[in-house]
Amino acid sequence: MARISGIDLPREKRVEIGLTYIYGIGLSTSQKILAVTGINPDTRVKDLSEEEVNEIRTYINKNLMVEGDLRRDVALNIKRLVEIGSYRGIRHRRGLPVRGQKTKTNARTRKGPKKTIANKKK
């Protein structure tokens, strides 16, 4: 079982796809990792030798921020924005979209379920 950065990679998938199970590694990053380490992207995770797994692990530890470190970094960045009172920080605090999307009709993912208000009698 290949275990990298505290994540068990799925055995039956190709290495290229298996690496994307690690938080902070997408498809393009996994392709770059495999190109640098010289491992065939079509190889299945179960077919990797221990030496190849160690190469991947070493490259990730030296060059990338993944999993807990990356999550902590993102959380600290958001916390900093909230503390300094920037526009983006205020949007985070209120639970609204941060990147300029309209909120009159959409933004249900960020705002949560619709809160209906009872109509006033005439």
Swiss-Prot record:
Q: Give the GO biological process terms.
A: translation
Where are the annotated segments for Disordered?
93-122
Q: Which domain of life is it from?
A: Bacteria
Q: Which InterPro entries match?
A: Rbsml_uS13_C, Ribosomal_uS13, Ribosomal_uS13-like_H2TH, Ribosomal_uS13_bac-type, Ribosomal_uS13_CS
Alphabetized UniProt keyword annotations: Ribonucleoprotein, Ribosomal protein, RNA-binding, rRNA-binding, tRNA-binding
- The reply on keyword Ubl conjugation is no
**GO terms of molecular function:** rRNA binding; structural constituent of ribosome; tRNA binding
Q: Name one GO cellular component term.
A: small ribosomal subunit
What this chain does, per the record?
Answer: Located at the top of the head of the 30S subunit, it contacts several helices of the 16S rRNA. In the 70S ribosome it contacts the 23S rRNA (bridge B1a) and protein L5 of the 50S subunit (bridge B1b), connecting the 2 subunits; these bridges are implicated in subunit movement. Contacts the tRNAs in the A and P-sites.
Q: Which family does it belong to?
A: Belongs to the universal ribosomal protein uS13 family.
Q: How does it assemble?
A: Part of the 30S ribosomal subunit. Forms a loose heterodimer with protein S19. Forms two bridges to the 50S subunit in the 70S ribosome.
Tell me what this protein is called.
Small ribosomal subunit protein uS13
Which gene produces this protein?
A: rpsM
